[in-house]
């Protein structure tokens, strides 16, 4: 796949003039590394090489000798509604989570597309464990398609890239020019070629590849001429943009009570939930995660709300003294970001087939790519990468035929 990627890229660069428009002020969109917050780089968006065994980006990172952190993560602490679980209870909790995902992943694809919620096994651990789903899907289980999860091609390994995944992606494509702060506002594909209007002027092209989030499409930030077909609009509505926000903590180096691979889960009520992973990049950085409706509520409450909730988790587990060891914090607010309106897509129950519809080309010149168009690697950076290769192959085939 790496060789095929290089071949397709060389052909595109050799035979075509490519202009990349980026609405944000940085390269990478939802995959961006910030070097200004902590002493080490911090990924504000995508940070994982998921399913590393079969992830083409993981192979490229290995071939380019990037340092990779491959340690598995596991629960060391769980605090639920004022009670810290014992080691035996944590073992049962982890076993339930494994069974929960097995139930979803083993669901019969021929059956009606149910919500993830309806496939959760009964257990005393269901109440807390189901909150893990929003951290994976960026949406709560009752609004998420079980078939969408069923079709995801999962494999071993969730790796981190030293100095950030966003920085790695930027390095990978550093020879391709990108115009930042340049959102597309209108796309006219009514005649031969495509006309794209931006604040910087009009670009006329033979083909256009649209990689914006389903949040941008649903909010009609881009006007299309002709309008998108009803079939395409329905697909967009069946693939809402979900929300996963990250809360970063930089601890004083003297604090040594947690290390890489350890995770703490914290629940208040039924769904006020966060999970904190320690020792990112084998450093003094920890990252808290909040997802789904609860993440939206925290974001609406304002900057600092998610950080405060994760601080409550840290104090519940390690005691109030931990606060004095926190040097710096940061938190993301992807729902408020009008370049995405969220983190990544999820499918509504009954909406799994929308991914293939979203990926359909219009008039052999307007192409759709991005994680939301992938039926087996959705919601991932490598899914977005693979979607780009698929579209490049489509363009080359059409161009050759013409």
What are these regions (language model features)?
Residues 39-73, 175:
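Conserved FAD-binding subdomain of flavin-dependent enzymes
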Residues 142-150, 193-195, 204, 221, ...:
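Conserved flavin/dinucleotide-binding core of flavoenzymes
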Residues 51, 62-159, 213:
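Mobile amphipathic helical/loop "lid" adjacent to a hydrophobic cofactor/ligand pocket
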């Amino acid at each position: 796949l790496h060789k095929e990627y290089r071949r397709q890229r060389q052909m595109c660069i050799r035979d075509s003039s490519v202009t990349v428009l980026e609405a944000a002020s940085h390269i990478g969109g939802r995959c961006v590394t910030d070097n200004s917050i902590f002493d080490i780089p911090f990924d504000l968006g995508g940070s994982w090489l998921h399913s590393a065994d079969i992830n083409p980006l993981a192979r490229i990172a290995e071939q380019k000798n990037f340092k990779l952190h491959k340690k598995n993560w596991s629960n060391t602490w769980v605090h639920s509604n004022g009670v810290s679980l014992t080691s035996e209870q944590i073992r049962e909790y982890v076993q339930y989570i494994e069974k929960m995902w097995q139930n979803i992943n083993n669901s019969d694809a021929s059956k009606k597309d149910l919500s993830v919620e309806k496939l959760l096994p009964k257990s005393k651990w269901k109440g807390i464990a189901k909150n893990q789903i929003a951290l994976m899907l960026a949406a709560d289980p009752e609004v998420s398609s079980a078939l969408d999860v069923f079709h995801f091609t999962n494999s071993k390994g969730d790796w981190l890239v030293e100095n950030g995944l966003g920085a790695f992606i930027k390095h990978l494509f550093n020879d391709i020019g990108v115009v930042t702060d340049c959102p597309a506002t209108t796309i006219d594909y009514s005649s031969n070629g495509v006309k794209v209007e931006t604040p910087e002027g009009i670009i006329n092209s033979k083909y256009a590849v649209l990689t914006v989030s389903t949040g941008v499409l649903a909010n009609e930030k881009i006007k299309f001429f002709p309008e998108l077909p009803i079939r395409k609009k329905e697909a967009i509505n069946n693939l809402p943009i979900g929300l996963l926000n990250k809360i970063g903590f930089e601890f004083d180096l003297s604090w040594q009570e947690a290390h890489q691979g350890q995770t703490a889960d914290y629940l208040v009520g039924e769904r006020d939930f966060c999970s904190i992973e320690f020792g990112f990049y084998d450093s003094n950085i920890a990252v808290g995660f909040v997802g789904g409706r609860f993440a939206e509520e925290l974001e609406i409450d304002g900057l600092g709300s998610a950080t405060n909730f994760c601080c409550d988790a840290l104090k519940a587990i390690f005691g109030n003294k931990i606060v004095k060891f926190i040097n710096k914090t940061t938190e993301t607010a992807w729902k408020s970001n009008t370049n995405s309106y969220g983190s990544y897509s999820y499918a509504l129950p009954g909406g799994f087939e929308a991914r293939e519809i979203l990926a359909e080309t219009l008039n052999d010149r307007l192409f759709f790519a991005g994680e939301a168009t992938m039926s087996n690697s959705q919601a991932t950076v490598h899914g977005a990468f693979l979607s780009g290769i698929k579209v490049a192959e489509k363009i080359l085939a059409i161009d050759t035929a013409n």
